[in-house]
Amino acid sequence: MFKSIKQIKSSIGFITTNTTRRNFCSNKIGGFTIKNVEDESKIKINNEISEIEKLRKKLLYQSKERGMLENDLLLGSFATLNIHKLTESQLRDYNLLLQQPDPDIFNWILKKAEVPEEFETEVLKLVQHHCKNDPLGYTRK
């Protein structure tokens, strides 16, 4: 079978020498070709997340993990469906909304209480519309 580690590594397509690292897959699978990398320090993996994406993830988490189960369900379903569609200014408005006490948010989105002027935003209207239109997918009779 295999007599050395080098034979094992070469059989699985990964060869390591002192100066060169080659990662490759067979041309038969996915059309990949041999890739030579002389200096690994030149490789930069771009896995940074933009500030707007960080805000989206934060708001999605905060929408699903509230103090009231009702808000978890209503805001969580809204955020899951719509957070990627919101503009940066809408995200800022939504962030401000989520900083308010849960009972207030609940009453505002269900229109059970008057909404203060600073929270009368397009985002609140989107949330209200979402909550009015069967957000959890239950069928009404």
From Swiss-Prot:
SUPFAM superfamilies: YgfY-like
One GO CC term, this protein: mitochondrial matrix
InterPro entries on file: SDH, SDH_sf, SDHAF2
Pfam family, one: Sdh5
Compartment(s) where it occurs, according to its Swiss-Prot or TrEMBL record: Mitochondrion matrix
GO biological process: mitochondrial electron transport, succinate to ubiquinone; mitochondrial respiratory chain complex II assembly; protein-FAD linkage; tricarboxylic acid cycle
Assigned protein family: Belongs to the SDHAF2 family.
Protein name: Succinate dehydrogenase assembly factor 2, mitochondrial
Originating organism: Dictyostelium discoideum
